[in-house]
Curated annotation (Swiss-Prot):
Keyword annotations from UniProtKB, A to Z: Cytoplasm, DNA-binding
GO molecular function: DNA binding
The protein, known as: Nucleoid-associated protein PA1533
Subunit structure: Homodimer.
Compartments (UniProt record): Cytoplasm, Nucleoid
Taxonomic superkingdom: Bacteria
Family designation: Belongs to the YbaB/EbfC family.
Translocase among keywords: no
Biased composition regions of type Polar residues, renumbered to the chain: 87-98
Principal localisation: cytoplasm
GO cellular component: bacterial nucleoid; cytosol
Amino acid sequence: MMKGGMAGLMKQAQQMQEKMQKMQEELANAEVTGQSGAGLVSVVMTGRHDVKRVSLDDSLMQEDKEILEDLIAAAVNDAVRKIEQNNQEKMSGFTSGMQLPPGFKMPF
């Protein structure tokens, strides 16, 4: 490979790394809302899986503790699934031009 070609590849790799870093920051800062019980429980979570807020409908204050715990767990799980889906959608656009093997996961 010629010297200029190698320099071009290195520059391209550096640009790709910068874009990847920016994409990872965007994904980490994204917020999603997971819900359960037809919206009676909602959880706001960041792309880093940090729970920022849990909201409970007032009507749930009369419910059995176990029901409430199940609804909170379901809302958290819903938020996690939404983060994973969001990450896959964003990264598929980023990696669409790359020749990656099937099932290859990007680093996160």
